[in-house]
Amino acid sequence: MTQTAEKPFGKLRSFLWPIHMHELKKVLPMFLMFFCISFNYTILRDTKDTLIVTAPGSGAEAIPFIKLWLVVPSAVVFMLIYAKLSNILSKQALFYAVLSPFVVFFALFPLVIYPYRHILHPTDFADTLQAILPSGFLGFIAMLRNWTFAAFYVLSELWGSVMLSLMFWGFANEITKISEAKRFYALFGVGANVALLISGPAIVWSSKLRASLGEGVDPWGVTLYFLMAMFLCSCAIIAACYWWMNRYVLTDPRFYNPAELKAKKSKPKMSMGESFSYLLRSPYMLLLALLVICYGVCINLVEVTWKSQLKMQFPNPNEYSAFMGTFSFWTGVVSVFVMLFIGGNVIRRFGWLTGALVTPVMVLVTGAIFFALVIFRDHATGLVAALGTTPLMLAVVVGAVQNILSKSTKYALFDATKEMAYIPLDQEQKVKGKAAIDVVAARFGKSGGSLIQQGLLVVCGSISAMTPFLAVALFAIIMVWLTSATKLNKLFLAASAAKEQELAEATAAAEKEASPAAKEVSPAIEGVS
C-alpha cells in the first residue's frame, strides 16, 4: 500500500485543521456530504414543526401521537425494507435507493401535496371525531386531519436517523481507518454545527419573503417551495459527493484498502428482545442505556410544552418558521463555542462524572425556570414589566435558551462521556453493548416522552392543564438520570483501573520476554565485532 510521508502537525494546526494536503481528496467530499445532510436535517426539523404546530385544528399536542404511532412504526418498516434491499443491491445502488424516496416526496410536497391539501385532508371526518371524542384526543384527531403534514413529519424524522446515522456514518466507518477517524470525525462535527449557522438564516430568509409577495399568494406555500428547493439542491450535492468518493477515492490505495479494513469488527444486528436481554445482564450497560433514555425523554417533555407556547406567540407559519430559523442559528453558535472551549476542558480538569452531570443539571435548572414561567406566569408581572416584554414571550425566549443550552451541552459533554464509557470495556462488550443501546435506548428515548405526554393529554385534556404534571415527571426522570450517572461513574472508574492494570501487566510481560532475547543478541554482536 502506498504511503505518503507525513510530517507531524504543530500545536495550532493539530487543534484547528489536523489534515494533510493529500488527504483533502478524501476529507472535503465527506465534510461536504455531512454538511449537506446536516443542512437538510435542520431545514426539515424546523419545517415539520411549523407545519404540524400551526396547521388548522392542530398544535404541539399532535407531536407525541405522531412520534409514537407513526414515526416508530415507520422506522421499523424502513429497517425491514433496508435489510431486504441490502441483500439485493450493491452498496452504491442501496445508497441512491435510500436517498430517492426523500427526494421524490420533498419535491412533490410543495408542488402537488401542499397546494391540494384541502382535497387530501379529511376535514369533515376529523370534525365529526372531534365532536364525539374527549378533548384529550385532539392530538390524535389533528394527526388524521392533517395526514399529509404528518407524513412530512415522519419523513423528516427518518432523514436524521436514516441519512445521518445509518447511511453517512455507516459509509464513513467503512472507509475510514482508525488513525484517520481520530482526526476526521471531529471536523465532521464542526461541519454539522456550521450547517446550523447557514441553514438557520436560510430558513429566516425564506420565511420573510411574505413581505414582497402580492395579494392572493400563499406566503407559507412560497416559503415551502424555496425551502424544499434548497433541500433538493443539497441532495444533488450529497449524491455527487458519494459518486466522487466511489469513483476517485475508493479506487486510490492511499485512502482505501478493503483488506486492511476487514480487520474491523462489524456491529452485530440485535433484535429488540436480544438487546433487552443483553442490557439486563450487564448493570454497566443498563446504566449507560438509562442515560440515553433519560436524555431523550427529558428533551421531549420540555420541547412539546415550549412549542405550544411558541404557537401562541407566533400563530402564523411564516413567523413561526422565522423564529425556528433564528433558534437553529443560535444553537449552532453556542454548540460550536461549547465544543471548542468548554467540552474537552471540563472532562480533562474535573473528570468523567462532572462531564456526565453537566447536561442533566443544565436540563434541570433551565427546565425548572421554564416550567415555573409557564405555570406561574400570572405571578411574574413584576419581572415581565422590568424586562419590557409579555409573560408569553418571556416563556418562549426562556424555552429557546433552555433548548439551546441543553443541546449544546449534550453535543459537547453528554455524547463525549457516553462514548468514553465504552473505552474500558472488552471488544465484545463494546460491540454488543453499543448495538443494544442503539436499538433499545434510542427508541425508548424518543417514544418514552411521547407515551407520558399522551397519557397526560387524555387525562388532562390539554397541554396547559398537564404542564404541572410534566414538570414533576421531568424532575423525577432527571433524578434517575443523576443517580444512574453517579453509579455508572463508580463502575467506569473500576473498569478503567482494571484496564490500566491489565495493560501495565501486558507491557511488563512483553518487556520481560524481550530482555532475554536482547541478552542473547548482545554476545553475538560482540563476537562479530
Swiss-Prot record:
UniProt xrefs under InterPro entries: ADP_ATP_car_bac_type, MFS_trans_sf
Q: How does it sit in the membrane?
A: Multi-pass membrane protein
**Molecular function in Gene Ontology:** ATP binding; ATP:ADP antiporter activity
One Gene Ontology cellular component annotation? plasma membrane
| Chief localization | membrane
**What are the Low complexity biased-composition ranges?**
509-520
Please state where this protein is localized: Cell membrane
| Protein name, UniProt field | ADP,ATP carrier protein 1
Q: What is the lineage of its organism?
A: Bacteria, Pseudomonadati, Chlamydiota, Chlamydiia, Chlamydiales
Gene name linked to the record: tlcA
